[in-house]
């Protein structure tokens, strides 16, 4: 059945139906020590317990409406909006009628966007050459660029030489959420149909196996998996080409990697978790345009990570500060959130924050694999852009510019194929192979290739400091043209050591002025989900968190989650523990899906509009 998409913009259509997977049978044990207790059902999502095997769903109308478009884009971040904008720019230039639909799971554009962010404006200026006249929110050019190594008590300054990737001359400090909101306005003005509050949950396929489009998930489902009286089926969006711009570790991209074997010829992706706060500080300490990065304390040399402090010129003395920890860390006792809070007490950091007020908090995973981890980008009916495949320049600590350029190149490649008079396709869904070729011939590919060895050079005996030495010698001499390519260590989920082989980390208690507890931090993210819905953090096997993760790794999920989603709590009866999932706290960072040593957690989309409500993060 076909209906205008705009008529479906109601809460009943604000989430997506996830792909079904094999039913997992309930295991027999739920305690750390006892094997006599039955496992409580922790997650009830219909991806685990299919509805066609649930009598409560008998007689429920499962018909879905469908809409047709030329191009469907999943995700309204910098990459997705760049692709949408460029498609409509080209359509206007060539007087072509092109329907472009963009869906975004956040309640409004920018609400799930989090980055530092120090923006290299190259791709942005290519897409919007008149951005100044249009009032784009690039208000803070970099005026001072600093880098340092932290010891427990001191900061050792390191000069930033011209030509090194961390040089920020010509860049802008931005609030990326505000920037993508502005980009959304530009896209809509060109005729892009932007639908916030719609979460893509299912990939649709043609009979020949090519991608047909996506479907939004159903709404009106109880926490126990039963339909509510308000149940409404999701919506299908069909397209000639579907662009997946979900951001880092997209849940649909995970399925595409397996379906089309897109990672057959690349290394596993490796990630970091970025935690960020926004402060209003004493105006006397405010240095608009100052950019400050550090490595070192409180992390040891074998744990990749670092920090940033960006002074924003937004009409008030704003400071964006954050901390990144590589998710290939080995100690299961490590808590990225608590390392962040401890870092703020360093003698070179704390004075800037004293007398200030924290006004926002958030977290998001980021790609760190770089050139070696880029998968195949195209497949019949679709392609990957932005942080979904992973185009972040790690030593530069930037990925927005490369994400935007990938979106622009994808749009140009798709437009050429859609408007070709000799259009030929072996599959029903168009296979736009030109996109990958164009990307490899662009400055994006050259930039990522040149820095490919810097992140993996930190795996040696000297750790992060070895990586700095490598950068200072080999990158300075060869400019990325050295005749070798270093490898990563493998998947981040395989890197944890057993708890018995590691030293517990004692973290200081937060003081409530500089450092804070987790729950008060999550409250500043604006995170909210419909409570009575199946948990979107699903478990393949309900026994694994206690029987394996807790017994071997001391329950690392209770530490690597930056939102307090996972807790091991005592059983109501008997000895032992059970895992409690506080799904309503989830900030959609994807860390659990990445770092879980058992790969038992599968993140799927909740009802559309749920999640964090960032304001210019």
Swiss-Prot record:
Residues 577-606 form the 4Fe-4S ferredoxin-type domain. GO terms for molecular function: 4 iron, 4 sulfur cluster binding; electron transfer activity; electron-transferring-flavoprotein dehydrogenase activity; flavin adenine dinucleotide binding; iron-sulfur cluster binding; metal ion binding; oxidoreductase activity; ubiquinone binding. The modification N6-acetyllysine is found at residues 96, 132, 223, 357. The modification Phosphoserine is found at residue 551. PROSITE patterns: 4FE4S_FER_2 (PS51379). Its EC number is 1.5.5.1. [4Fe-4S] cluster binds at residues 561, 586, 589, 592. Keywords: 4Fe-4S, Acetylation, Electron transport, FAD, Flavoprotein, Iron, Iron-sulfur, Membrane, Metal-binding, Mitochondrion, Mitochondrion inner membrane, Oxidoreductase, Phosphoprotein, Transit peptide, Transport, Ubiquinone. A ubiquinone binds at residues 305-306. InterPro entries: 4Fe4S_Fe-S-bd, ETF-QO, ETF-QO/FixC_UQ-bd, ETF-QO/FixX_C, FAD/NAD-bd_sf. GO terms for biological process: electron transport chain; response to oxidative stress. Monomer. Accepts electrons from ETF and reduces ubiquinone. This is Electron transfer flavoprotein-ubiquinone oxidoreductase, mitochondrial. The gene is ETFDH.
């Amino acid at each position: 059945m076909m209906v205008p998409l705009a008529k479906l913009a109601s809460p009943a259509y604000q989430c997506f139906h996830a792909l079904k997977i094999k039913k997992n049978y309930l295991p027999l044990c739920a305690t750390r020590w006892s094997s006599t207790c039955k496992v409580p059902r922790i997650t009830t999502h219909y991806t685990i317990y299919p509805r066609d095997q649930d009598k409560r769903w008998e007689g429920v109308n499962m018909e879905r409406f469908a809409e047709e478009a030329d191009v469907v884009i999943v995700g309204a971040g910098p990459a997705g909006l760049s692709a949408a904008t460029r498609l409509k720019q080209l359509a206007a230039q060539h007087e072509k009628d092109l329907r472009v639909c963009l869906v975004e799971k956040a309640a409004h554009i920018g609400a799930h966007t989090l980055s530092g962010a120090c923006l290299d404006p190259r791709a942005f200026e290519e897409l919007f050459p008149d951005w100044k006249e249009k009032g784009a929110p690039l208000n803070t050019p970099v005026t001072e660029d600093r880098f340092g190594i932290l010891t427990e008590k001191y900061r050792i300054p390191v000069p930033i030489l011209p030509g090194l990737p961390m040089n920020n001359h010509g860049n802008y400090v931005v609030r990326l959420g505000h920037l993508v909101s502005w980009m959304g306005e530009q896209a809509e003005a060109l005729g892009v149909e932007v639908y916030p509050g719609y979460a893509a949950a299912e990939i649709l396929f043609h009979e020949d196996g090519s991608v047909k489009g996506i479907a939004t998930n159903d709404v009106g489902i109880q926490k126990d998996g039963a339909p509510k009286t308000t149940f409404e089926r999701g919506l299908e969006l069909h397209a000639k080409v579907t662009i997946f711009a979900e951001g880092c570790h997209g849940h649909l991209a995970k399925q595409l990697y397996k379906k089309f074997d897109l990672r057959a010829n690349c290394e596993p992706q490796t990630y970091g978790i970025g935690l960020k706060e926004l402060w209003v500080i004493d105006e006397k300490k405010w240095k608009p345009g100052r950019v400050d990065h550090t490595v070192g304390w409180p992390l040891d040399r074998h744990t990749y990570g670092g920090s940033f402090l960006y002074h924003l010129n937004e009409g008030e003395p704003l400071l964006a500060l954050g901390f990144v920890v590589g998710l290939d860390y080995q100690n299961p006792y490590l808590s990225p959130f608590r390392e962040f809070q401890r870092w703020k007490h360093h003698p070179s950091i704390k004075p800037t924050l004293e007398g200030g007020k924290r006004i926002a908090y958030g977290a998001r995973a980021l790609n760190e694999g770089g050139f070696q981890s880029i998968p195949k980008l195209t497949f019949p009916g679709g392609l990957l852009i932005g942080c979904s495949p992973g185009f972040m320049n790690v030593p530069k600590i930037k990925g927005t510019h490369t994400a935007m350029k990938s979106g622009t190149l994808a749009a140009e490649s798709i437009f050429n194929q859609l408007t070709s008079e000799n259009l030929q396709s072996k599959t029903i869904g168009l296979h736009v192979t030109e996109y990958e070729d164009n990307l490899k011939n662009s400055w994006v590919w050259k930039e990522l290739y040149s820095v490919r060895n810097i992140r993996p050079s930190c795996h040696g005996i000297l750790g992060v400091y070895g990586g700095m030495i490598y950068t200072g010698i080999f990158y300075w001499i060869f400019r990325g043209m050295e005749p070798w390519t270093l490898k990563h260590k493998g998947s981040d989920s395989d890197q944890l050591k057993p708890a018995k082989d590691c030293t517990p980390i004692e973290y200081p208690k937060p003081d409530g002025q500089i450092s804070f507890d987790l729950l008060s931090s999550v409250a500043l993210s604006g995170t909210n989900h419909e409570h009575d819905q199946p948990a979107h953090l699903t478990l393949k096997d309900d026994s694994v968190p206690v029987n394996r993760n807790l017994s071997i790794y001391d329950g690392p999920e209770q530490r690597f989650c930056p939102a307090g989603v996972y807790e091991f709590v005592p059983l109501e009866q008997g000895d032992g523990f059970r895992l409690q999932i506080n799904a309503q706290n989830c900030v959609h960072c994807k860390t659990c899906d990445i770092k879980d040593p058992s790969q038992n957690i599968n993140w799927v989309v909740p009802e559309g509009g749920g999640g964090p409500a960032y304001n210019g993060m």
